[in-house]
Design a protein with these regions (language model features):
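A short amphipathic alpha-helical interaction element
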Residues: 1-2, 37
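Acidic/proline-rich low-complexity IDRs
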Residues: 3, 136-139, 176
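Functional-site microenvironments in short loops/helix caps that host divalent-cation chemistry
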Residues: 10-158, 162-167
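Short, structured beta-strand segments at or near domain termini in extracellular proteins/domains
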Residues: 167-178
Length: 178
């Protein structure tokens, strides 16, 4: 089994302790996130990965067509955004969306697998990863605790270099079912 890279293990170890509510893991590049999913897949025998952009948005919307899974707007009692707290909040602190997912709006940006594309023209019509266009940039979704309301909408997306780390960037994993 491939070892988890030391910098990824250190970052995750600092944020997760058994029986302790944790803050999201931050300062993670897409490369770090993918290394973690490869390690977890090898360790468990299940297939873990970053979600595609389409999967992420579908999960964030939770069956809605509104800007937020909770409706047309959101406030700080439902999400950590707008630098109101000055830091990340505990994982699961806010109410889940209709699919049971917590913290999809704000708290930390989340990596997805897709390459950056300026728009949706030519996007896959299913949930497949979009590998066309500019793969020197990848996609972040969800916004973070420092972003404004516009940037934490379900549809908002941001380009970022896959090797870069930032204080407000983390990841959420998906599991491929057998």
């Amino acid at each position: 089994m491939r070892a988890l890279p030391a910098e990824v293990a250190t970052a995750i170890g600092q944020k997760t302790k058994v029986g302790v509510v944790a803050r999201p893991v931050i300062n993670m590049s897409q490369n770090d996130a993918k290394a973690y999913t490869e390690w977890l897949s090898a360790k468990t025998g299940n297939v873990y990965r970053l979600p595609s952009e389409a999967e992420w948005e579908y999960a964030a919307r939770a069956g809605t067509v509104t800007p937020f899974s909770s409706g047309k707007t959101i406030n700080s009692s439902w999400s950590n955004y707008g630098n109101k707290k000055g830091k990340t909040d505990w994982v699961g602190h806010y109410s889940p969306n209709g699919f049971g997912l917590h913290d999809v709006h704000g708290n930390v940006w989340e990596w997805v697998e897709d390459c950056w594309n300026n728009g949706y023209a030519g996007a896959p019509s299913d949930t497949n990863v979009w590998q066309a266009s500019d793969c020197r940039l990848r996609v972040l979704r969800g916004g973070s605790w420092v972003n404004d309301l516009q940037s934490v909408r379900s549809a908002y997306r941001q380009a970022f270099e896959p090797g870069n780390r930032n204080f407000n960037v983390g990841f959420r994993i998906a599991r491929t079912l057998p």
